[in-house]
Amino acid sequence: MTQLYNPRKACTLYIENQILISNILVLVYRNLIAATDKVFLIWRVAFPAVYIFVVGYAYSALIGDRGIVVGSLSITYTSFIAAGMIGFNVMNASGIAGSIIWNDRRNGMFQQLLVMPFSRIQYVISSLVATILVGLASAALVILIGLPAMFQDISLTMGSLSYTFCAVVLGSIFFGSFTIILSTKIKTSEAHNVINTSLFLFFAFVSSAFYPTQGLPESLSIASYFNPLTYVVNITREGIFSQVDEFTNIEIFILILFSSSAFIIATRSIAKMHV
């Protein structure tokens, strides 16, 4: 039996959806204002610039004329690390999601927000949307900064750029969710700082961000493929240099699994967090 169209129910559903979106946007704006300041913005520029133009060219002198293979293309080390810094910077920027929740817990702001017409799921989604926006802005910034270093090798198309876009978004979701999980479990500031720093160092250096995994010892090379940053960086590079192939789609699928799993765990962690 077909159901009759109920205009009142449809109108109510529309209003509820509008309120949901409005609440999330309000929290996103609040998160962006709270998490970004002059020091944060300067660091987002200075850190990748130092790695690209100091570390990149210094290591290039050691490597010599040997290129690094990405797909069917041989690129310079400066191009390699410039593209790698996009994923690395996304990981660093994603820390704002955990920082927001950590500070809200300590300052009692989380309780105040829940008294207002905001739900826990809206809180999580808004934190991740803010993280994605910062991640995309960071990626665009690194591309602009690294353009002189990558100019001779870069080969962007709309199709390949979409892979880089997906890598940045999925990477932001994973690392944003990961920092949310840590912030809900850790009790002290000292432990929060030590654990965050240690884990992010592991993510950074047991990955393909700074060097190709093919030349690493076997155990380290295998470990890097359990690291989501490896997939973020690989997909980003393959998009930047138009070296997308069937394996890139497999990497996207694996990254989706990492990101969706982390998001589910982060949502449950917030739902169980005591006010």
Locate the predicted segments by residue:
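Junction motif at the cytosolic side of a transmembrane helix
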Residues: T2-R8, L62, I240-Q243, F253-V275
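Hydrophobic alpha-helical transmembrane segments of multi-pass membrane transport/permease proteins
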Residues: N23-L25, T36-G64, T78-A93, L136-S138, ...
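Membrane-interfacial helix-loop-helix junctions in multi-pass membrane proteins
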Residues: A34, S155, S207-S261
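Transmembrane helix segments
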Residues: Y57-I63, S183-F226
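Hydrophobic alpha-helical transmembrane segments of membrane proteins
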Residues: G71-I100, A167-S172, S177
